[in-house]
Amino acid sequence: MVFVQVALDRLDSRGSKVADYLLVIDMQSDYVAVGKAYHEELIAAVNDKIASYPSDRVIYILNRFFWERKDRKKKFATGLLLVSSRIFEKRWASCFTNSDLKDFLEGNGTKSIEFIG
């Protein structure tokens, strides 16, 4: 699991500092599934973090390798809390290679991002 915080200045409902947006990265059945290492612990930790953010501040990033067909639907990990329809795909290692994601974040004046996944 990756967990990064930078310059957080917003507060969640518990009074804890949060970023402008939470990016939930690679939490899909390809990587996180029953029988894979730390499945239950990872889902629980990620769901706790998702629950700490307003739903309109949660963005999901699905990994679709550049060689994978676009018509093959990617599935989120079983048990993952889905609170937002903001879903972006990445085809390379960095999610910021997706210009739609970059445009969304820039267009909304994003100053801080928290990553988990």
Language-model segments: which ranges?
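Extended hydrophobic/aromatic-rich secondary-structure runs
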Residues: 1-7, 106, 115
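Active-site acidic carboxylates
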Residues: 2-87
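Internal catalytic-core helix/loop-beta-alpha segment
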Residues: 81-117
